[in-house]
């Protein structure tokens, strides 16, 4: 601005100042705030505003507070955690669970004086599950989760740290409500791709599934059906989640019938309990086969999303590679002459002297490779957990849990020639 312009603007400034001072105090405050707003718009109006995704904010909040991994929309569903146990089994680890509103309901198999107990110590967890359904039929929560008493077990997958605490803290309760019944285990290895039940093989012994030859009669007795499904397939191992609606679709009297069958069957206790590992999906869904695609089930149920089938298969292959490296390393470390015949000890010593450097190099190489593979497994798993925190990624993993044209389900991959559907379902009790 040129110096002579001051003479032109000064009278205007004086006039504005006079007008401003003559305004009421409230009007002056409003005018000042309006001016401040205009200045801020001018300063920041051209800047791009980027919002942090809500789910990432939730994930950070939950991580900081050590709580449930998934922040639920709306009020959290009520949950009973039914723990099938004996008096000698410790289930105190349940106090470390972070599921809001969860009530632990222990069912004790061998103590008739316990608050909740089985009528008789028979049928393993199946007896206690049915007793719970019968006892709580009119007082059920939104969701019932029924598990064994062990916190760490092979029944829980390696991807879930083989930990029931990890599994339940990461369980998406909304997904349970959507599906109404599900198995907490998702891998096909036992129950879907191997150790499935063919009910027509009533005379065949099976080392992996000793209950197979009893399944036809067990199914027929429990469901009052003559035409039994040929194939029964679902992930093992009788740890399930089920909604109030699904439980009540089955008449209460039918649970009493299942209890009576477990009490009176001539089958060995271990066999009668195992038959129910293959029948829960039929009881609650009316399906003989319930094997969701693994990577989609992990993504939807536990929010561990690898990004697709190929990426998930790569993670599986890395784990298989790690197992092979561990086996080779054990062999190398065990080649020190233990168990050798006396006349061969001296020869072994000579071989050891000449080959020690080679063995040492092999050991170091195997240890280095094992470390690298283990780190790759860890990183991919952590990335999958982060990816699963975003709902859009869970949707992108695949809509259909049971397969589509791009990725067929278990019926196409494992049982393409088998008639899978049951010929009618009856809930009548004999």
Q: Where are each of the predicted segments found?
A:
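ER/Golgi luminal nucleotide-sugar-dependent glycosyltransferases, focusing on the catalytic module
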Residues: 2-430
